[in-house]
Amino acid sequence: MARTVCGCSWALIFIIMSLLVKAKIDVCKRGDVTVQPSHVISLGSAVNISCSLKPRQGCLQVSSLNKLILYRFHRRIHFQRGHSLSSQVTGLPLGTTLFVCKLACSSKEEIRICGAEISVGVVPEQPQNVSCMQKGERGTVACSWDRGRDTHLYTAYTLQLNGPKNLTWQKQCSDYYCDSLDLGINLPPESPESSYTAQVTAINSLGTASSLPSTFTFLDVVRPLPPWDIRIKCVNASVSTCTLQWRDEGLVLLNRLRYRPVYSRSWNMVNATNAKGRHDLVDLKPFTEYEFQISSKPHLQKGRWSDWSESLRTQTPEKEPTGMLDVWYMKQHIDYKRQQISLFWKNLSLSEARGKILHYQVTLQEVAEGNATLQNITERNSWTWTIPRTGIWAAAVSAANSKGSSLPTRINIADLCGAGLLAPQQVSANPEGSDNLLVKWTSPGEGATAVQEYVVEWRELHLRGGMQPPLSWLRSPPYNTSTLISDNIKPYICYEIRVHALSGDQGGCSSIRGDLKHKAPLSGPHINAISEEKGSILISWDEIPAQEQMGCILHYRIYWKERDSDSQPQLCEIPYRVSPKSHPINSLQPRVTYVLWMTALTAAGESPQGNEREFCLQGKANWSTFVAPSICIAVITVGVFSMRCFRQKVFVLLLALRPQWCSREIPDPANSTWAKKYPIVEEKKQLSLDRLLADWPTPEEPEPLVINEVLPQVTPVFRRPHHPNWPGKGQRLQGRHASEEDTGSSASSPPPPRALTAETGPAVDLYKVLGSRRPDSKPGNPVSHLTVLPVDYLPTHEGYLPSNMDYLPSHEAPITDSLEELPQHISLSVFPSNSLHPLTFSCGEKLALDQLKMGCGSLML
């Protein structure tokens, strides 16, 4: 089986070679192309190219029809009719040029006859800078040189090395571009001063060139191997006593070391003679990662430096921290007794930390008392306490590593925004480039000279995931009124920026919101509640998630329209505020269903609308439309009713129009204790007017009351008699017991009934006329038996007389004396006399009080 496969392979190779030979032969079967003087010429030389046809290879055996054409690549340069063609070509460029001869028997077809390649080149230049090198003690010798310009021809380079004792080593380079050769021999270190000579020869078709001989010794050409097994050791873990160690070849006498912190670009260089693989370093920084490299040389003056060793990266030991922390704080009131103090500090730099910071020690102490001290140890860069609002407090923060602690940074806790005169003015924040935010402000006017330092702080405006956003700050000298924020800032995030001006323990501040980049929010606010309050609605909403706000929100818009309405919605634009997330709207009509939604706006545009909510205002109509008329009517009514005359007339009208069933029950004086003990005098007995006037002197304060009967023609008038014992206003009179005789006489002798007659004299208060006899009175002195009822005894002096009084005297003797009194007459001229029906009755034995009505000076029977 193996023999069969081998035989097939050889047969295939033979067939391929036969085809190639036949193709070679068949290329120029119609003619030949010759080149004179050579196929290889130097630059600028001329060449003669000839093309001839072989016998019986022309066009139909007629030579006049043969047209030979010479092409240079694909461009026609010469043609001639006949069996041959000859042309001289000059100005050929460097490199190889192809010429092709073709036969044209017609204008449509050309037959290839043969072709030739002409190479144009130059004589090789003399090789320069021949140098040889041997890598390590056991390496081989390799030499390199500069070839010079390109010959554009195949050029062979030969390296020859001659040594002591007529030793010669030679090697030729077969590559087209050859500039180095490895002889594959090792020069022994036993004879470091022995001389060697190297020479390079270049040969091509146009000529030969040789380099100058290069002579060297073993020390000149040997290049030690790079050091290896590099390590560093520090005694007692102290950075001040660190030793770098490595391994080298035995012939090395000189070393050079370079090292640097990994974050630095410049190297520190150190030379070490006869170091024997170790060197002490005294200027290393603590807790710093360094990169170390070492190179070697076999001789102080001669020889070559080895390549740099592989880098060793290691961290030096720690040392106690140096420097002080940059501490900042925030103060927030919780209630009237407590406040919250939040301390923040920045990390120390690597050069200041000098080790891994394990924790921070924080102390908060009341300055005045000195006994209230709070201490804590934390690994974070912030701490928060709740302390009383009274007293002056100070804080101290220090950092600690495994070797010790830094000096504490002490600050006094003051109101950072308490001094209004120190507040910076015209604060602005604008993007600067693509990654920076430029904050500018102006000095605080009168307090500018007192400013010792500016502090610019910024933090994300919105909480993410319920966590407090980190606080960042920068300090600026008092002569600067701008700063560039580039750390801890991201695009499409809104930041609250505050500028503090500090002067001792006082400070003033101003704030603004800013963003690095912004675009329209991705979603709108979510309305979570709509409530009705006093004829208006209160809309409450949830904040847009921070990752969807896409910058600082400038305004909110509330849209509303009637449900199922195609009209344009109304809107209300609200400036952004952190809290509360609610706003009233008082322009909605009651009992109309509205659809409401909200959007948010940044400087880049408006967000999509949020959720829709329907609401119908169920409150009463707008009460404000009734307030003004009600106030006017009330003022007019109060003004009119302040006039007594008008008030009395209106009251009488209301009494006349009032239905009988709603009449007020009037107390009956006849049922009183006084009426039972002291019955009224008999009506038929006539009182002697002369005796009555003699016994009644003029009262000190007469209070006449006119009682008018509402009749078309008759108005009875009663006159109040004067009596020295008449009680003052508001006093009660003690009744007198009547004798049995008078009582019996009154009951048994009723007078004949008669009508009341009008009287032109002054009116008398009817209730004050009513009286009783004294217990010691006699029939001959009836006037002395009368006791006047006070006006205050009745429920009201403007109401009716009691309706259930037993009787009134059916007639009264006329009183004609001119008494000193104050007449009062009220005319009901606003009502026609026939509007009220006159009361007609027949006088019987008694006149009941339920037939008599009194009010505002009028008596109606």
UniProtKB/Swiss-Prot annotation:
Keywords: Disulfide bond, Glycoprotein, Membrane, Phosphoprotein, Receptor, Repeat, Signal, Transmembrane, Transmembrane helix. Residues 24-622 are extracellular. A motif (WSXWS motif) lies at residues 305-309. It is found in: Membrane. GO terms for molecular function: cytokine binding; cytokine receptor activity. It holds the Pfam family fn3. It is a single-pass type I membrane protein. Residues 1-23 form the signal peptide. One of its GO terms (cellular component) is receptor complex. Residues 126-224, 226-317, 318-415, 423-520, 521-620 form the Fibronectin type-III domain. Glycans are attached at N48, N129, N166, N271, N347, N376, N480. It comes from the Eukaryota. Residues 644-861 are cytoplasmic. SMART domains: FN3. A motif (Box 1 motif) lies at residues 662-670. Residues 718-761 are annotated as: Disordered. The chain crosses the membrane at residues 623-643. GO terms for biological process: cytokine-mediated signaling pathway; positive regulation of cell population proliferation. On IL12 stimulation, phosphorylated on C-terminal tyrosine residues. The modification Phosphotyrosine is found at Y800. Receptor for interleukin-12. This subunit is the signaling component coupling to the JAK2/STAT4 pathway. Heterodimer/heterooligomer; disulfide-linked. The functional high affinity IL12 receptor is composed of I12RB1 and IL12RB2. Il12RB2 binds JAK2 (via its N-terminal) through a membrane-proximal region of the cytoplasmic domain. The WSXWS motif appears to be necessary for proper protein folding and thereby efficient intracellular transport and cell-surface receptor binding. Belongs to the type I cytokine receptor family. Type 2 subfamily. This is Interleukin-12 receptor subunit beta-2. The lineage of its organism: Eukaryota, Metazoa, Chordata, Craniata, Vertebrata.
